[in-house]
């Protein structure tokens, strides 16, 4: 076996690997391009070549250097990004290329259990994942959903909500402003930069590999769902809504419309993505659509035994700054700018 380091955004070896392997959207060159365009990180991947020179395994990663120190993440701001390996020997061959960097390494696994058996990595967090098989007929998908979901969808339809595809960056901006407010006022969190969503729009929506569904009440945008597409899977990536219009139940209707869009495109799975375990309401919400549930494992290699005192202090400061900038008295444009400056540190 031979191993090479490549740029996963444009190298043909990486493209061939993700085409033939059980890859997800977070392995895709487009997603990695979104990350590097937004944050300026260097993205790389190690690829193992078989005796014929064909790619047979690989792992993408970003090396990040900032006020928190140096670290390797596979991959930042991705729900999960399993190493594309089928055996323990290939996993060790890949990760042994990164260990000599002598900095923390973070990997998020959903489908691949091989890294969990590596004693050099420790489990530091778990999250929930939900997915829905789109292959059954629409009537069967409807029947599998909870009665409360049926009622919510019918209510939104009775009240005249209309769902359509976003057509412009002006509508993308309207979605982002809802997203910013949900993050700030509901969760006390900063939002990713608007440029992140612009890059998703450019690399996915304009490339016909994703879409933004909007729910409108009397011509007013009241909610939106951002979906990405990769291979045979539709990814439910972002949701936002106006609190004052939640009584119309737009979010259930949006997902039902997303399911139907996925079926029309011939897709086989709707990936509902990551939910933190303490987000009990979100977990219950995703279960109501008849989803399968699995666990995402967050693994970390700590060559120095854990965070340095400086890193701990900086992360505490980051938490305090988040609280300050998401205070309800802070103007939303200031909160947005804080996300532009600080969100890159949440890796």
Task: Briefly describe each language-model feature range.
Residues 2-54, 58-68, 110-129, 135-247:
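A conserved beta-strand-loop-helix scaffold within acyl/acetyltransferase catalytic domains
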Residues 106, 164, 269-273:
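Short catalytic-loop micro-motif centered on adjacent basic/acidic residues
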Residues 74-114:
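A gly/proline- and charged-residue-enriched helix-loop-helix capping module
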Residues 47-50, 55-58, 67, 78, ...:
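Aromatic (often tryptophan-rich) hydrophobic motifs at membrane interfaces
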Residues 42, 101-103, 266:
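Short loop/turn motifs at secondary-structure junctions
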Residues 62-80:
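A short glycine/small-residue-enriched secondary-structure motif
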Residues 45, 63-65, 116-140, 267-347:
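Active-site/acyl-donor-binding loops of N-acyltransferases
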